[in-house]
A protein has these predicted regions:
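Beta-turn initiation residues at beta-strand->coil junctions
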Residues: 45-47, 72-74, 92-96, 145, ...
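Gly/Pro-enriched, hydrophobic low-complexity segments
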Residues: 136-205, 209
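Flexible, processing/modification-adjacent segments and terminal tails
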Residues: 87-154, 215, 228
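Short, cysteine-centered beta-strand-loop-beta hairpins and adjacent loop/turn segments enriched
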Residues: 49-52, 77, 148-152
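An acidic-aromatic
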Residues: 61-115, 177-181
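N-terminal leader/targeting segments and the immediate start of mature chains
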Residues: 14-67, 128-131, 212-217, 221-233, ...
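Sec-dependent bacterial lipoprotein signal peptides
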Residues: 1-16
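Short, solvent-exposed coil/turn segments at beta-strand boundaries
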Residues: 34-38, 61-69, 84-89, 135-136, ...
Length: 240
């Protein structure tokens, strides 16, 4: 009889324990996935600026030890920019302008980045006042954001699927209006990248560009790239 009661109590404890998956469990699981050696994702980014709406096709490649390659393709004019970070620095390659730029920058760690998983996870972890809920089988975080160059952006809603993959992120103003929306279409946590994939020459060759270097005396002497990481200082410009 005692054994029967013991097993009944054990079953109740186990059943009670099930379903108590909370935000800390989710954060831990996301951290394990994102901290792996690499990932690749694709998605669509919509940016609202006053009466203008810009849509970008986004592709992000990440390899451990601070290697990032981000492609932003403007859907309206088919112009692409590639942000590259490796051991040599931060670069922006702009094929439409036949130029590449090298910057002194802490990118992507100096502010929020809606299309980088590490950045979004850091926003979640660093916000002690974050809100968390479960809705329609998905998990939803609401956190503060850090966009020093755009004070209109104050918070974000992060939707994560039941499979623990990022689904959609809305960056909101103080009235709760979405000014940036990132829809994730594909996330691969076990990608394979070709050799030298994160080297500048490889990026320039893939964009069919020449490797001609031009020294720049001041920012005014250069044509600014369409996408400029926050907190950057131009140090070099190359004709591509």
């Amino acid at each position: 009889m005692k054994k029967t009661i013991f097993f009944l109590i054990l079953i109740v404890i186990l059943l009670t324990g099930c379903g108590k998956y909370n935000e800390n469990d989710l954060i831990s699981d996301l951290d394990k996935k994102i901290s792996k050696s690499s990932y690749y994702l694709e998605g669509n980014l919509e940016i609202v600026n006053n009466d203008n709406v810009y849509n970008y096709e986004v592709k992000v490649s990440y390899k451990k030890d601070n290697n990032y390659r981000v492609s932003l393709l403007n859907k309206s004019n088919n112009h692409e920019q590639i942000i590259l970070k490796n051991s040599e620095g931060v670069f922006v390659v702009t094929p439409a302008l036949n130029k590449s730029f090298k910057f002194q920058s802490d990118w992507p760690y100096n502010n929020s980045q809606v299309y980088l998983l590490q950045s979004v996870l850091n926003d979640i972890k660093n916000d002690d006042k974050r809100q968390f809920k479960s809705k329609n089988g998905n998990f939803i975080f609401n956190t503060e954001v850090n966009y020093p160059n755009n004070r209109k952006l104050v918070s974000q809603e992060i939707v994560i699927s039941k499979n623990h993959k990022f689904d959609k992120i809305k960056v909101l103003d103080e009235n709760g209006i979405a000014l940036m929306t990132m829809d994730f279409k594909k996330i691969d946590f076990t990608p394979t990248f070709k050799k030298n994939y994160f080297e500048l020459n490889t990026v320039m060759e893939s964009a069919k560009v020449d490797n001609t270097t031009k020294e720049v005396d001041s920012l005014e002497d250069s044509i600014y790239p369409l996408v400029l990481p926050t907190g950057t200082k131009l140090t070099n410009e190359e004709k591509v």
